[in-house]
């Protein structure tokens, strides 16, 4: 995981796509958010964790596992349990409602809030999700998303390389449904 790959790893970068409504198909975009497509083989002018990290699915899974382990991975403490707890604690006041999670529509309300860098499920039943209370999640611009569910001891990482999220097929909802249907005893 880094802000650039360097030329030696350029062949490991997956292409990014966008849905072209006029053409009725997925295409390689010529620009990103009104600007030139970034060159991830070169260091960016400004390193922005919210706008330009490149990673592997395995790195993202290890990060998610570290969060599930309350800040520890492979016997090494990377974050304090208190820091991870803060990440999963809602900080949005009751009178503030937002309608996006960055790349797709989402409702922050009494059942779903936002902690330090994560959307947080406060009340799974009220949120209408199969995830457990305390689940932390987020998505990225290119159809990347993850969740960490401490109630059910589950992590999930999805990466589809599509600007605008996972698309109209709502792959995120399908992934959650199939994952939790596969659990023998979801605790919810």
Predicted regions and their residues:
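Short, structured beta-strand/loop micro-motifs enriched in basic residues and often containing a Trp
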Residues: 137
